[in-house]
Amino acid sequence: MLDIKWIRENPEALDAALAKRGAEPQAQSLVALDEKRRSAVQKAQDMLSRRNLASKEIGAAMAQKNGELAEKLKAEVAELKTLLPAIEEEDRQLTAELNDALSRIPNIPFDDVPVGKDEHDNVVTRTVGEKPRWNHTPKEHFEIGEALGYMDFERAAKLSGSRFTVLTGPLARLERALGQFMIDLHTREHGYTEVSSPLMVRAEALFGTGNLPKFEEDLFKTTDDRYLIPTAEVTLTNLVREEILEQEKLPLRFTALTPSFRSEAGSAGRDTRGMLRQHQFWKCELVSITDADSAIAEHERMTACAEEVLKRLGLHFRTMTLCTGDMGFGSRKTYDLEVWLPGQNAFREISSCSVCGDFQARRMNARYRGKDDKTNRFVHTLNGSGTAVGRCLIAVLENYLNEDGSVTIPDVLLPYMGGLTKIERAA
């Protein structure tokens, strides 16, 4: 959430930033609403001050045996007591209205973020590796998995409907191996602390990360008003909600391997075959909590940690800087990692790493105490996928496919596969 004080002082800057995102100007309406709220606050404060002063004057009038003045003051205090609740309620309503309006305003992009409308305006930052060179014809992951006999969409549909998958045997093990490899890499070599956290959260947690109220249609909600997490970013980031941290203990780096749940409400007709766009999928999440001075360097570091997963798997990928029109709601700058899928003859997103500034921290009231001046400031938050396990499985199947239809296990995963070096068709 943005700072209303900053908006009051920089209305043109807000509208210019929104224009870069393709959004309508909001500064005038926000400032007008804030002025109404501040007027109500001032009116309530003036009324309280007058009531308190009148109460003191009653005592003075009584001491001077001025009964007429005392009665007049008592009547004034009684009237103020009657009027005050309505003014305080107006203040509460205007504050809630302003906070709701602010909660729907996206974050301000950094100046170095390319301006653009959609994914076609994203910029290639770097490319790693090369496309595999084969004599055989590439296949899509669902063709490979079904031919091997370990990927079943029909039974998954019987169980749960569309956008679900059943994996069995060595493919189920490969999925587990990928997740274990990622979490081991990030905890053993990249300095992240592993966290096991709930898969269901309250609305307040999703508000903190910016998923609510704007994106409720993308979430699965339980009958007792909890939500299934769309990403472990929600739980990991909210670990510091309503806390004041010591600056010298920053950065905090958390990672978790969890299922993620998404309704894919806006994805009708997109990637309907296979595992690319699922209602339920495993993902290794990375979250950093830091201060303003360290956030940009931490963003580069986090992205490098995610890239290392793909490098060690020997996968060809590119890192994209997202344009203003394709960035997430809470992001100030985002890098997407896109892995090469031979079966699609295309790069597809496998990780997204974002720096959010203090946008989420304001929503969570998460702060740190400066080590020198002891002033409390909002933390800066970052999040990224390190990486999406299902999409990594897709990439391994398509890039390690052999001419006979078998799939070679990448060397880095062999310690997790119980001696299996190749996945072959089920007998």
Swiss-Prot record:
Zinc-finger as a keyword? no
Task: Decide whether keyword Iron-sulfur is in the record.
Answer: no
- Which GO-annotated molecular functions does the record name? ATP binding; serine-tRNA ligase activity
**Entry's EC annotation:** 6.1.1.11
Checking CDD domains in the record gives: SerRS_core
Entry-linked Pfam families: Seryl_tRNA_N, tRNA-synt_2b
Catalysed reactions listed for this entry: tRNA(Ser) + L-serine + ATP = L-seryl-tRNA(Ser) + AMP + diphosphate + H(+); tRNA(Sec) + L-serine + ATP = L-seryl-tRNA(Sec) + AMP + diphosphate + H(+)
Record's domain comment?
A: Consists of two distinct domains, a catalytic core and a N-terminal extension that is involved in tRNA binding.
HAMAP family the UniProt entry points to: Ser_tRNA_synth_type1
Q: What is this protein called?
A: Serine--tRNA ligase
Organism per entry: Rhizobium etli (strain CIAT 652)
This protein's gene is called serS
